[in-house]
Amino acid sequence: MEPKTKKQRSLYIPYAGPVLLEFPLLNKGSAFSMEERRNFNLLGLLPEVVETIEEQAERAWIQYQGFKTEIDKHIYLRNIQDTNETLFYRLVNNHLDEMMPVIYTPTVGAACERFSEIYRRSRGVFISYQNRHNMDDILQNVPNHNIKVIVVTDGERILGLGDQGIGGMGIPIGKLSLYTACGGISPAYTLPVVLDVGTNNQQLLNDPLYMGWRNPRITDDEYYEFVDEFIQAVKQRWPDVLLQFEDFAQKNAMPLLNRYRNEICSFNDDIQGTAAVTVGTLIAASRAAGGQLSEKKIVFLGAGSAGCGIAEMIIAQTQREGLSEEAARQKVFMVDRFGLLTDKMPNLLPFQTKLVQKRENLSDWDTDSDVLSLLDVVRNVKPDILIGVSGQTGLFTEEIIREMHKHCPRPIVMPLSNPTSRVEATPQDIIAWTEGNALVATGSPFNPVVWKDKIYPIAQCNNAFIFPGIGLGVIASGASRITDEMLMSASETLAQYSPLVLNGEGMVLPELKDIQKVSRAIAFAVGKMAQQQGVAVKTSAEALQQAIDDNFWQAEYRDYRRTSI
């Protein structure tokens, strides 16, 4: 459902002159009217012409096109964001296909690696371990009192790039930009946070420009006590906030999620968001290929927290479709660097133990090896779906893909590792190795593949199809928690917007131009499920839709009226 056009009320603000021009949330630049220029002491501080936001956006687009590298484009857009946020979001929404890969993956990876080098202006909150005793004061320094969404990272596992220290701040900034651009959440309600607990990246420690705490990472009790101090301070300052954990290392991600998901409204996008968008994609792809997800056999390469999170959500979805838990688990095979996870494998992580296959059930497999490789698994399982979350490039070899295609006429192949340099196989190769028969969705953006004069659009299995809608749904409904059922309702809603399912052609996932419409639909489904689950106050469907409309921010200038502080 499209947002209703609503007349914006005037905004009463106390700032004036250069202070107002330096306030990104309020600055209009050349779009200040003559009356506003007189009332806010701006006469002579701006060129004579009063422009519309579209005229400003057109100039910015021309300037943007003058930059030749993606990182330079990223720096330029971040500069606009730190100068005039309304213009930034109008520009991004006008060119979302072009700019989403620049403000987020894959370009944000390079921006994180070079964070201290390209740093220009502070955005968000940096909380170092050295300042742990000032936690409450730090959060009180945030000028926005009505924060509704926080994205926090400790920078230890940034995309597939590893420990980037405070450079990881680029991820919360980029993620929250998508909450606004795709989900309509006002930038005034968002706060990026990095927990600076040191870094084990020697290159950063040796870099004279590095701006973070030059110390090896704290671990164990020190680490968890520090994170807990942060959580308690957030609860004190903004008790109803939605907190998203982002790019925490595998050893910490699941423990933190399990510890806090029932204490504060929170989720981990790497685990739950990735799982939700993947399951939504698989529901749609399964329908397009014929049948339900519960009928498919699935092999994973990568059994970390993200891979296991996806697997558990697939199992939950196939149970919804009628399988018993035992039958659902027998259809999912997890492969990591030591081979297939089985009940005979030592040193399994806690979240892996429920995803093992019984070794005794594999006695008739065609292999002589004790370590069951990905090729062994594909040859014997004959999967319908192959998912890569390994973070290692090239592991979906031609032999493996062709072996899969032997037994599956319409294979679903999803190399999800980020950034592009870490992808398990390129869509071009997968399409060629399957004679054009594979359904492909990737974690990073790829151009359409041309094979034998036919164009194959490649869907990006992008979490941005999920988390902005979840955030909007939580805010609109006032949900106090994010339940598994809320995430699954988001997946099902996403699948309903698949062009391939709706039209029999096109991508598995919607086009980016439709992402706000999809986010609004997901917000409604999530809010409705929150009410059914008892984590939000029950209202009518009309009231929930109205709350979504009321909370959906548009990149438009409002009239200003002056008031005193």
Curated annotation (Swiss-Prot):
Q: Which gene encodes it?
A: maeA
The family database entries (SMART domains) matched by this protein are listed as:
malic, Malic_M
Required cofactor(s): Mg(2+); Mn(2+)
The cysteines joined by S-S bonds are none
Q: What are this entry's molecular-function GO terms?
A: malate dehydrogenase (decarboxylating) (NAD+) activity; metal ion binding; NAD binding; oxaloacetate decarboxylase activity
Under the heading InterPro entries, the entry gives: Aminoacid_DH-like_N_sf (IPR046346), Malic_enzyme_CS (IPR015884), Malic_N_dom (IPR012301), Malic_N_dom_sf (IPR037062), Malic_NAD-bd (IPR012302), Malic_OxRdtase (IPR001891), NAD(P)-bd_dom_sf (IPR036291), NAD_malic_enz_proteobac (IPR023667)
Query: So where's the catalytic machinery, residue-wise?
Result: Y104, K175
Annotated site (Important for activity): D270
Top-level EC class as recorded in UniProt: oxidoreductase
Query: What are the binding positions for a divalent metal cation in this chain?
Result: E246, D247, D270
GO CC term (a single one): cytosol
Signal peptide from the UniProt entry: none
Keyword annotations: Metal-binding, NAD, Oxidoreductase
Enumerate the SUPFAM superfamilies for this protein: Aminoacid dehydrogenase-like, N-terminal domain, NAD(P)-binding Rossmann-fold domains
**Assembly and interactions?**
Homotetramer.
Which Pfam family, any one of them, does this sequence belong to? Answer: malic
Q: What is this protein called?
A: NAD-dependent malic enzyme
Q: What is its EC number?
A: 1.1.1.38
Question: Any note on cofactor binding?
Answer: Divalent metal cations. Prefers magnesium or manganese.
**Which residues does NAD(+) bind?**
R157, D270, N418
* Recorded catalytic activity of this chain's protein: (S)-malate + NAD(+) = pyruvate + CO2 + NADH; oxaloacetate + H(+) = pyruvate + CO2
Record GO biological process? malate metabolic process
Which PANTHER family does the record associate with it?
Answer: MALIC ENZYME-RELATED, NAD-DEPENDENT MALIC ENZYME, MITOCHONDRIAL
